[in-house]
């Protein structure tokens, strides 16, 4: 038991190595962050590595680490000097703590920040950490400027930092495109064990991933085997067509092996730069049956008001309702004031093609109910039927009888038997409202209006072919 406790303590130390002095040619700029609005009350240290090659004028590439950084500095120095990787500014972020007046920690925020499955930490980096970094200057007066292109940005972490690195890029591929995760906590801490399934079901992101773990990695067996879950994540990434490599080392929950291969990992992560990592082609038959090759989401409107709703109208257009104002929106992005009598559908009720079923969303639930429509117009035999990964928002059917659900994780698409087959992701992540116009799907995400051409249509032409119970 004593050995087990010592092993746990040592593994945590490796996971959150402090930033200490090491041999390097660049400069370290340090500051404290105590004013976070996303993680209120937390205090943390930020260390910024600025290589001597950085000129203070051209925005540099970015390397973010949630797991220390002193061991990386000589590696970054050498690879940058040799031209094997671009000029990179390193930002090393410690986990937050809340301290009392005497300086004693009363809350450790590490797991809450790093193990979560939402986009909160990505938002923290985007809106709080990086703006604070860019307000600093080096000792010789160079301003710190960081590229905002995803292809120029990489992120690393060990243990909880490992799953955080992956989650940040997964949630916001517009921010980061290159990921190094070691001993990643893809276990049942805060939902990370869902990733092997989600990776398979979601449309691939344009990110490149290097996975490292050790064959005896099981920090606490209560939560599962770290190594086994990392193997499942690797399998899922390969299935979904990602640019992925891995290295399985000997040992337990430690960053030692990850640090040893850091130079080779960095070379591979930035191979082909500045080209963006390629978006993979998934082996999912559902994804193949839905997506038009080369077609992506197009932003056709901004500053969409909170509470705005989309409604189907015809093959050519949808209705965008913002309060009392109604507009027709077309796939080319044009918008005109809606005229005449406009009948708006209930966004939380959907009629199955052919009229045999009715689906109803229940607020605050990750289930959608299904009812059978009787000849006299009543709903019967209601059941919780469609199981979701996040609470349901607006719902609608396509012509094949698949249910589309707007949610915080994107647009969840369920088959006729109530199972999520795929999740369509938008740049903003959360989707609040959706509507079909023919084979164009419209969606609102983070105040922006998007449209995408699909191989599926929202036009119902009778009862679709049954998938039976398979």
Residue ranges and their predicted role:
Residues 1-4:
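Positively charged n-region of N-terminal signal peptides that target proteins for export
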Residues 17-23:
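Sec/Tat signal peptide C-region and signal peptidase I cleavage site
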Residues 278-470:
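Sequence-structural signature of mature extracellular/luminal beta-sheet repeat domains
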Residues 23-281:
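Non-catalytic cap/lid and distal C-terminal segments of serine-dependent acyl enzymes
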Residues 8, 67, 157, 183, ...:
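Residues that line or immediately flank small-molecule/substrate-binding pockets and catalytic motifs
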Residues 7-16:
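Bacterial N-terminal signal peptides
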């Amino acid at each position: 038991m004593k050995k087990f406790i010592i092993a746990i303590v040592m593994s945590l130390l490796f996971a959150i190595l402090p930033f200490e002095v090491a041999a390097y040619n660049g400069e370290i700029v340090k500051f404290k962050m105590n004013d976070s609005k996303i993680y209120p009350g937390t205090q943390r240290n930020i260390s910024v590595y600025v290589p001597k090659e950085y000129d203070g004028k051209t925005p540099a590439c970015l390397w973010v680490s949630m797991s220390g950084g002193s061991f990386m500095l000589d590696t970054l120095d050498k690879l940058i000097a040799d031209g094997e990787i671009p000029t990179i500014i390193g930002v090393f972020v410690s986990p937050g703590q809340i301290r009392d007046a005497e300086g004693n920690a009363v809350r450790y925020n590490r797991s809450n920040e790093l193990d979560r499955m939402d986009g909160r930490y990505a938002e923290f980096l985007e809106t709080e950490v990086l703006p604070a970094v860019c307000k600093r200057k080096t000792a010789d007066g160079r301003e710190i400027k960081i590229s905002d292109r995803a292809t120029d940005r990489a992120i690393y972490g060990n243990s909880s930092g490992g799953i955080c690195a992956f989650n940040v890029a997964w949630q916001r591929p517009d921010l980061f495109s290159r990921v190094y995760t070691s001993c990643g906590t893809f276990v049942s801490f805060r939902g990370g064990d869902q990733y092997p399934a989600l990776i398979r079901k979601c449309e691939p992101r344009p990110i490149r991933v290097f996975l490292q773990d050790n064959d005896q990695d099981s920090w606490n067996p209560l939560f599962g085997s770290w190594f086994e879950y990392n193997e499942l994540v690797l399998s899922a990434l390969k299935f979904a067509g990602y640019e992925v490599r891995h290295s399985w080392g000997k040992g337990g929950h430690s960053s030692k092996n990850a640090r040893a291969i850091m130079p080779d990992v960095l070379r591979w992560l930035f191979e082909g730069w500045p080209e963006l990592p390629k978006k993979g082609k998934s082996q999912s038959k559902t994804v193949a049956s839905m997506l038009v090759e080369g077609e992506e989401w197009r932003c056709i409107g901004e500053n969409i008001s909170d509470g705005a709703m989309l409604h189907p109208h015809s093959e050519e257009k949808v209705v965008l309702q913002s309060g009392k104002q109604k507009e027709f929106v077309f796939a080319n992005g044009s918008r005109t004031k809606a005229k005449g009598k406009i009948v708006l559908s209930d966004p939380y009720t959907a009629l199955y093609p052919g009229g045999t079923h009715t689906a109803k969303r229940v607020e605050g639930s990750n289930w959608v109910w299904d009812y059978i429509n009787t000849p006299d117009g009543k709903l019967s035999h209601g059941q919780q039927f469609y199981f979701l990964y996040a609470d349901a928002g607006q719902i609608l059917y396509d012509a094949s009888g698949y249910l589309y659900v707007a949610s915080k994780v994107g647009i969840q698409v369920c088959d006729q038997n109530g199972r999520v087959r795929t999740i369509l992701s938008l740049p903003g992540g959360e989707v609040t409202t959706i509507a079909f116009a023919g084979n164009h799907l419209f969606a609102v995400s983070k105040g922006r209006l998007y449209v995408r051409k699909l191989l599926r249509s929202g036009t119902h032409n009778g009862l679709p072919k049954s998938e039976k119970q398979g």
